[in-house]
Amino acid sequence: MSYSYQFLEEVAVADLAFDAAGDSLQELFQGATNAVIDALANPATIGSTWMQVVDREEADPAALLFDWLSDLAYWKDAAGVVFSKADVTLRQEQSGLWKLQAVLYGEPVNPSTQELRADVKGVTKHLYRVSEQNGRWAARVVLDV
């Protein structure tokens, strides 16, 4: 598995921006997911007492990534949790639709035992892009914090 992400301090002043990349679309999704998880809290300080299964479908992989990363912000607020990890599976159906199946793991927010970082409120369309070049996928994402 080969994915990466890098936070970009010079891109967004009041928000948090990152670039993610992967050798496949699956790896791009995992890298971008890990970037959001890492932006919220140090995953090494988060347990796995909470779990949520998420299924999503979209024709456009860029729209699917945007919606999925938005789901992370939603579940953080709706369940009052931060995440230790997410197992993400992505595949293209015969119909052409992209299907994401993910399992989020985490636990309720507890500042006394967790290294909390940014309060991510959502994903913005500002500078958002997903592209593929020579078999390598890349995304730029700006998070509203």
What positions do the PLM features span?
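Intrinsically disordered, low-complexity regions
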Residues: 1-145
